[in-house]
Amino acid sequence: MKVISAEALAKVATYGAIVEALREGFRADIATPVRHHHETSAVSTLLLMPAWSMEWTGLKTVVVKTDNAVKNLPTVQASYLLIRNDTGETVA
C-alpha cells in the first residue's frame, strides 16, 4: 500500500487536473451508496463512504471528534483507501 502525503498530492493535484478528474468521475458508472453515519459516543461520529466501479473500490472514513480542540487536534480525522477490484489489493 502506498501512503500519499499532503505535500506529494499538492505537487500533482493542480486545479485543472482536479476539475478534469471530477468531470470524468461524474460521467463514470460509479456506485455511491448513502454514507453510513454512526454516533459512537457523545463526542464522536464515524462516517463511512464507500464507492466502486468495475476497476476500483474506494472507502473514505471520517471520524469527527468534537472534543479534539481541547487536545489541540483537528476535529475531523479522515483517510481514503483505494482498492483494485481485480486483486483486492489496497494500493493507496
Show which residues each predicted segment covers:
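N-terminal ligand-binding/catalytic initiation module
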Residues: M1-A92
